[in-house]
């Protein structure tokens, strides 16, 4: 059995409700035991909560993606009106405390995705750092693991997490250097998220005991499905690639990565 530790199946910008149901069924037929829907804004996190609240073995996290840390984006100012991506600390805490009554009524199992993204000049770095610290404070307060989004910002990332030695988590979709992979492995207890990007790149591969499998669906579709929308069922293809890459039986890959996800997220 497999766990997809990072996807966005709840996001109706990419999936209709009917498509999401079909993809859930497809995933289950391909041995995906559980999936985790990752929030990227206040509003999106609430959508993830609602989706998990009505589906068995679906979990959610509360997060604000670094690109949503400011109302300034590459395309200019955000639309006028309420800013769910910039919800205040009280709203964030309330989202963690208050779970709607439903079939499964699940609480969040983590904070994320949160972090730093310096790839685009249009994203305010100071705003990202401020929000990142606020989200880490939430994770500390509620004793929740963190799904980290870090791109071209590892110096600041390592500097900030020094102030949070109790934080545990996973570096989602690691795409950086061997040097920074070594720092993560040696200086933190964080896991590394391995997804479809690894199947067509030359990225360094972490040891199995530090790997979580993820799809990031609908993004980062693995070989041999590149060019079509990604879905949770394709995590099996990532596991098969990893088995070949590491020279380890697929059954062991499934067992160990599932054990890692259960240990981190408590599911």
Mark where each language-model region is:
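Mid-domain alpha/beta scaffold segments of enzyme catalytic cores
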Residues: 1-267
């Amino acid at each position: 059995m497999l766990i997809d530790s990072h996807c966005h199946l709840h996001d109706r910008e990419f999936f209709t409700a009917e498509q999401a149901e079909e993809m859930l069924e497809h995933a289950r037929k391909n041995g995906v035991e559980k999936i985790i829907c990752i929030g990227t804004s206040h509003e999106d996190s609430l959508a993830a909560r609602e989706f998990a609240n009505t589906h068995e073995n679906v979990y959610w996290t509360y997060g604000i993606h670094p690109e949503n840390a400011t109302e300034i984006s590459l395309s200019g100012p955000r639309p006028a009106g309420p800013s769910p991506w910039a919800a205040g600390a009280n709203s964030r805490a309330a989202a963690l405390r208050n779970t709607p009554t439903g079939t499964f009524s699940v609480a969040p199992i983590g904070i994320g995705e949160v972090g730093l993204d310096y790839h685009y000049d249009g994203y305010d770095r100071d705003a990202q750092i401020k929000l990142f610290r606020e989200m880490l404070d939430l994770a500390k307060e509620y004793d929740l693991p963190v799904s980290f989004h870090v791109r071209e910002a590892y110096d600041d990332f390592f500097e900030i997490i020094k102030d949070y030695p109790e934080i545990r988590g996973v570096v989602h979709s690691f795409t950086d250097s061997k040097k920074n992979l070594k720092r993560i492995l040696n200086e933190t207890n964080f896991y590394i998220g391995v997804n479809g990007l690894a199947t067509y790149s030359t990225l360094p591969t972490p040891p199995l005991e530090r790997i979580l499998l993820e799809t990031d669906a609908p993004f980062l579709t693995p070989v041999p499905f590149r060019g079509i929308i990604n879905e949770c069922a394709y995590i099996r293809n990532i596991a098969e690639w990893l088995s070949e890459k590491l020279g380890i039986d697929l059954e062991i890959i499934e067992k160990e990565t599932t054990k890692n996800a259960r240990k981190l997220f408590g599911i």
